[in-house]
């Protein structure tokens, strides 16, 4: 896998990452200076008269303070960069997920997408800011230590890195694949946790009604435990990599130094200070080697996140987003010509469907379950694309119209009202936030919602809970209808929009809406007599086609 996403985001924040990397390099310079100064100080204390102890001590303290200051700056700037990268990643991921077609959301678990935009993007932002940006300083510390070892004693200075570095690569080779597999398992387990929580919280009434709280609690607990165990295993390995690599490198260096006491090896020492410096740089070399090992482990974990993000970002947005055609207010003439459609892995629902709805016509679709009523609605709203055939609006192929401009021609009320967790007003003005108070009241009255809204202590400011949980089914439908009526589009689509109304409320709605719907194209999916009475034409869909049950001028 090519880390294209990693490179793209690194390039986007190259200024911040380069600055962090530059300060990290300055910190590594201070780090490299300290062993030499410490060795000079130790030699001076041991009696080397050629060393100025005061000057050496001052330089050592300066290097320590500089390293501390640089490390603090790196930590603060890394946290700031991580926050900005995380915000950008989440925003871009959310925007792209929103642009994906409904068919994508139907074939992917909500928990996977929630895990992606919340937890997985955090891994990538942390890797970019806290790990990758500090790589230059770590590499410089390791490289500088190797160069200085060679300058002090070319013999041992060459042998130490030749034995220490292979320890790093062997360890990484052995653990890299294991970390990648663990990373994938952790992501799947976290997605399960999100999915179970989302599903169970939306099913609380059913879970309580069937008294299955214990089963769902245990299922969720099992998902949490699986995720915990996998993350613990992953943490153990990543925690193991750096220190153990450092230990093995240190033991290797010690073995080389011991062997260096043999005749002919290490005989070039010129002073005690150089001996101390060689020992200090040998010890220093093990730290960046361990850090590089830890960075490699983090990269293996992050690779899985990058692969998952690339899969989502590579999924194409809805085709209509690329269309350039604009749409003024439509007259509402709709035609489906030779339309075929089948859901993935299922038999065809529509085969060669030809259906025309005139502008201003009210058409009711009836028929048994599964004959394609809702499928027609999904195709009209471009939630799905037909496998064959053509759909036009006022004679224009809808695939040539910008999908957002096209959908603004519709007022859609689904069978299951889709409501925000905010106030009644926020739900009614959804997409029409600048609506005037009198417009909101009129739409609510037409939907037979104003009486119950005005009876509430906070009226339109009443908070209705997630998905309108604090309202009855009929009240939720009334708010959804008010939302569509406020939009005042040329075309309405009502999918069992009054199925939760009482008979009196439905009759009042039909009576009030006769004038409002005049001149509008309306497509109804309903079996209720009061709503059917609105229709100019009633069409019965069957597995083999359709026929008019009622046709009046």
Language model features: what each stretch is:
Residues 59-71, 161-166, 238-252, 269-294:
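Hydrophobic alpha-helical segments in the permease module
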Residues 17-70, 150-155, 268-272:
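Transmembrane helix-loop-helix hairpins at lipid-water interfaces of multipass membrane proteins
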Residues 83, 91-115, 119-121, 195-219, ...:
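Short intracellular "coupling" helices and adjacent cytoplasmic loop segments at the cytosolic face
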Residues 1-31, 46-59, 74, 78, ...:
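Membrane-integrated ABC transporters
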Residues 12, 16-26, 59, 133-185, ...:
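Transmembrane helices of ABC transporter permease
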Residues 328-553:
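ABC-type nucleotide-binding domain
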Residues 212, 236, 284-312:
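Cytosolic ends of transmembrane helices, especially the final helix of ABC transmembrane type-1 domains
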Residues 12-15, 102-106, 119-128, 132, ...:
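An intracellular "coupling" helix at the cytosolic face of ABC transporter transmembrane type-1 domains
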């Amino acid at each position: 896998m090519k880390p294209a996403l990693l490179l793209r985001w690194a390039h986007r924040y190259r200024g911040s990452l380069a600055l962090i990397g530059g300060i990290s390099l300055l910190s590594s310079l201070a780090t490299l200076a300290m062993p030499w100064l410490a060795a000079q100080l130790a030699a001076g204390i041991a009696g080397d008269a050629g060393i100025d102890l005061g000057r050496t001590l001052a330089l050592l303290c300066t290097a320590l303070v500089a390293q501390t200051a640089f490390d603090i700056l790196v930590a603060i700037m890394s946290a700031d960069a991580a926050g900005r990268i995380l915000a950008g990643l989440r925003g871009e991921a959310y925007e792209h997920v929103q642009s994906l077609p409904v068919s994508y959301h139907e074939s992917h678990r909500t928990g996977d997408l929630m895990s992606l935009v919340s937890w997985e993007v955090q891994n990538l932002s942390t890797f970019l800011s806290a790990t990758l940006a500090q790589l230059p300083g770590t590499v410089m510390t390791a490289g500088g230590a190797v160069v200085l070892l060679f300058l002090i004693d070319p013999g041992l200075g060459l042998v130490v890195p030749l034995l220490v570095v292979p320890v790093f690569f062997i360890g990484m080779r052995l653990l890299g694949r294991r970390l990648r597999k663990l990373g994938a398992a952790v992501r799947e387990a976290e997605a399960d946790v999100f999915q179970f929580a989302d599903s169970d919280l939306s099913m609380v009434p059913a879970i309580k009604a069937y008294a299955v709280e214990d089963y769902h609690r245990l299922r969720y607990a099992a998902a949490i435990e699986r995720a915990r165990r996998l993350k613990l295993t992953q943490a153990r390995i990543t925690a193991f990599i750096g220190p153990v690599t450092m230990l093995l490198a240190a033991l290797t260096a010690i073995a080389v130094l011991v062997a260096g006491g043999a005749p002919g090896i290490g005989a070039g020492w010129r002073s005690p200070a150089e001996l101390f410096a060689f020992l200090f740089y040998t010890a220093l070399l093990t730290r960046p080697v361990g850090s590089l090992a830890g960075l490699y482990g983090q990269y293996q974990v992050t690779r899985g996140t990058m692969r998952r993000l690339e899969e989502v970002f590579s999924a194409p947005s809805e085709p209509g987003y690329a269309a350039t055609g604009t749409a003024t207010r439509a007259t509402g003439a709709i035609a489906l010509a030779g339309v075929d459609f089948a859901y993935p892995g299922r038999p065809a629902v529509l085969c060669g469907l030809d259906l025309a709805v005139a502008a201003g016509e009210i058409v009711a679709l009836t028929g048994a379950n599964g004959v394609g009523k809702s499928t027609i609605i999904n195709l009209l709203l471009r939630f799905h694309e037909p496998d064959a055939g053509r759909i036009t609006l006022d004679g224009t192929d809808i695939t040539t119209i910008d999908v957002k401009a096209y959908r603004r021609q519709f007022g859609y009320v689904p069978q299951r009202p889709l409501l925000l967790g905010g106030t009644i007003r926020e739900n009614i003005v959804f997409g029409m936030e600048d609506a005037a108070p009198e417009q909101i009241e009129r739409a609510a009255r037409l939907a037979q919602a104003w009486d119950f809204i005005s009876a509430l202590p906070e009226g339109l400011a009443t908070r209705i809970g997630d998905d309108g949980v604090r309202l009855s089914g009929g009240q939720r439908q009334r708010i959804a209808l008010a939302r569509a009526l406020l939009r005042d589009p040329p075309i309405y689509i009502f999918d069992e929009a009054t199925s939760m109304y009482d008979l009196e409320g439905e009759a009042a709605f039909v009576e009030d809406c006769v004038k409002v719907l005049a001149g509008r194209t309306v497509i109804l999916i309903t079996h209720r007599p009061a709503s059917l009475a609105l229709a100019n034409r009633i069409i019965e869909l069957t597995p083999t086609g359709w026929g008019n049950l009622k046709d009046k001028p």
